[in-house]
């Protein structure tokens, strides 16, 4: 299978890249359930004969409406007549599951050489597409890379300071940059090694938004930070079981 790199990298100098790797599982679709409403209406002037309204089906938009209706068994009990068909349990709600988006997250790293803050959000639109938003604010020297990876991605350091994706677990995803902005300059502040002095350091701000399709089942954020005095690798994954009716069983 072809090697895919979809990792976006925030460099203090202002370069941005995006690569996504994933597994070929997609979020399960949902269908609108249907139910039949059967009503019986007695004919008052003809004894021992009853007429029935023809059954009709309509989509159920919200299963909570069923709580406002009396069960068919109780309705027939009040009228003193038996029901025509056995009662069936109501189908589950047809609400669209948005299991891919899991809200805001941030990473704040402070070292002698760099002060870094990264914020982001992943939004599932419920139609097979999702948006990725990132912002980064850095003062000093260092590199930060942020990737969208599957849960099977190992957390480890790389000598080349890049994130490589195994070919067997890769798949091509459609992503395009919607918006990007980079600002660079110099900022003066108290020196970390000597607070009595004032130092001038590089300052960079950047933000970007991507629109992607064909997401994998569970997405994790993978952060790798490298500087002259510190390095960090971290993977953050959402609680998939909280968003889905079916449990998630990781593989790989």
From Swiss-Prot:
Kindly state the tissue distribution recorded for this protein.
Highest level in brain.
Transmembrane feature ranges: none
Q: Which GO terms describe its cellular component?
A: extracellular region
Glycan-modified residues: 62, 127, 137, 143
Positions of the UniProt region annotated as IV (linker domain) = 158-166
Record's InterPro entries?
Answer: Nxph, NXPH/NXPE
- PTM annotation, UniProt: May be proteolytically processed at the boundary between the N-terminal non-conserved and the central conserved domain in neuron-like cells.
Locate the coiled-coil region(s) and give their ranges. Answer: none
User: Where is region (Disordered) located?
Assistant: 27-58
Cross-referenced PANTHER family: NEUREXOPHILIN (PTHR17103), NEUREXOPHILIN-3 (PTHR17103:SF14)
Please give the family membership noted in the entry.
Answer: Belongs to the neurexophilin family.
From the Swiss-Prot or TrEMBL record, give the protein name: Neurexophilin-3
Organism name? Homo sapiens
